[in-house]
């Protein structure tokens, strides 16, 4: 779902400090 994808983005951003969707 879109909501879960949004949570995944925020989680990845927090974990890696660089948003994985920036690539």
Curated annotation (Swiss-Prot):
The organism of origin for this protein: Crotalus mitchellii mitchellii (San Lucan speckled rattlesnake)
Identification of the protein by name: Basic phospholipase A2 CB2
Function: Snake venom phospholipase A2 (PLA2) that shows presynaptic neurotoxicity. PLA2 catalyzes the calcium-dependent hydrolysis of the 2-acyl groups in 3-sn-phosphoglycerides.
Primary location group: secreted
GO terms, molecular function: metal ion binding; phospholipase A2 activity; toxin activity
Tissue/organ expression: Expressed by the venom gland.
Record text on subunit structure and interactions: Heterodimer of an acidic subunit and a basic chain. The acidic subunit is non-toxic, without enzymatic activity and comprises 3 peptides that are cross-linked by 7 disulfide bridges. The basic subunit is toxic, has phospholipase A2 activity and is composed of a single chain.
Compartment(s): Secreted
Cofactor note: Binds 1 Ca(2+) ion.
Keyword Secreted on entry: yes
Domain of life: Eukaryota
Coiled-coil stretches noted in the UniProt entry, renumbered to this chain: none
Enzyme Commission number(s) from the entry: 3.1.1.4
